[in-house]
Amino acid sequence: LSARRLSTRKVPVLFEAPLACGLLGSFVQAASGGSLYRKASFLVDGLDKPLFAPHVSIDEDPYLPRGIGSGAFDEEGVRGSRREVVSGGVLRGYFLSSYSARKLGMTSTGNAGGAYNLELRSTQTRPDDDFEAMLRKLGTGLLVTELIGQGINYVTGDYSRGASGFWVRNGEIADPVEEITI
């Protein structure tokens, strides 16, 4: 409904929660041991290198009370641990099973079966920030409500997907936008 296109630009972006979960899933795929030992990830040799903006950290907590992914052990019986996977935007750890860890000459992180209870944190937001607070902090930028296609290349790290959403101006939704590429 009267959606407009945007010219090419670099702006802050806020993804709706379900889309942010999908992006986090793509990160886990790229940082998984299977992708790494097959050399099918752009994160090979990525430890201790910047990956995200400096305000982003990602924690894993397999012991989170009542967490959907909580458990004392992974699918191989290896005890997991609470850890920072990304700290200040820097990649600090991979998601390794016993098998993938051996193939890489590393130690299992207790991630046979995947990641457990990931928490994305940002120094630019607070845990009690609601949607409106996040829009205010975004200021002027793009709120993405839909992603189209599967334009993710895990080997190179290239990411190109169609998107639509809303242009945000001064912390308020201003205009619908469509036919944009991220």
What are the functions of these language-model segments?
Residues L1-F27, A31:
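Internal alpha/beta scaffold segment
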Residues A31-S41:
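Mature, solvent-exposed C-terminal subdomains and processed small-chain segments of exported/organellar
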Residues L6, A30-A31, V44-I182:
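Dual-mode signal for accessory low-complexity, basic/Gly-rich regions
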